[in-house]
Regions:
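Short, Lys/Arg-rich flexible segments
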Residues: 1-154
Length: 154
C-alpha cells in the first residue's frame, strides 16, 4: 500500500521556483559575503587580533626601533590591510591580499626559512610569529548565515 499526496498551491510553487532560481546563481550572495568579510578582515588590523579573537604577537624591540607605531602588521604604508580584497568567480569567493609577504605575516616564518640573500644573510633575518588575519570569526559566521538567509528570502 502506498499513499501519494499532491499539493498544487501556486504560491508555494512560485516560492520554490524563486528559491531554485536564487540557488542557481550564487554570485549576488557571494559578493555580499565578500564585502562583509573584507571589511571584517580589515578591522582585525585595527584590533591587532586573529579571527579567533587572539591578540597578535607584539613586534620585537628591533622591529619597533625600525618603524613608526607599535601595532603589528601596521606598517607606514598600511598596504597589507588596504589591499585586502575579494573576488567571486565560478561560484567561489576568494579573500586575500596580493602582497607577497601576506602569507608570512599570516602563517609566520622562522629565521632563514627562505634561504639567504646575496650578502649571505638569512631570509627572513629573524623569526616572524604568525599573526593570522584571514578567516572567519564567530560573528563573521553569523553574518554569512544572515546573508544566505536574506538571499534565500528566509
Amino acid at each position: 500500500m502506498s499513499i501519494k499526496i499532491t499539493y498544487n498551491d501556486l504560491e508555494i510553487r512560485t516560492a520554490l521556483d524563486g528559491l531554485l532560481s536564487k540557488m542557481n546563481d550564487l554570485t549576488p550572495a557571494l559578493r555580499d559575503m565578500g564585502e562583509e568579510l573584507m571589511l571584517s578582515t580589515k578591522q582585525r588590523f585595527a584590533k591587532s587580533e586573529s579571527p579567533d579573537g587572539d591578540a597578535w604577537a607584539p613586534n620585537s624591540p628591533v622591529t619597533l626601533a625600525r618603524k613608526k607605531g607599535t601595532s603589528p602588521l601596521i606598517g607606514e604604508s598600511r598596504r597589507l590591510r588596504n589591499e585586502i580584497s575579494y573576488s567571486v568567480k565560478n561560484g567561489e569567493l576568494l579573500i586575500g591580499s596580493p602582497m607577497v609577504y601576506a602569507a608570512v605575516q599570516h602563517f609566520g616564518a622562522s629565521r632563514g626559512q627562505f634561504g639567504k640573500n646575496k650578502r649571505n644573510s638569512p631570509i627572513p633575518w629573524g623569526n616572524i610569529p604568525a599573526r593570522p588575519f584571514l578567516g572567519l570569526s564567530d560573528t563573521d559566521k553569523e553574518n554569512v548565515l544572515d546573508i544566505i538567509q536574506e538571499h534565500l528570502g528566509l
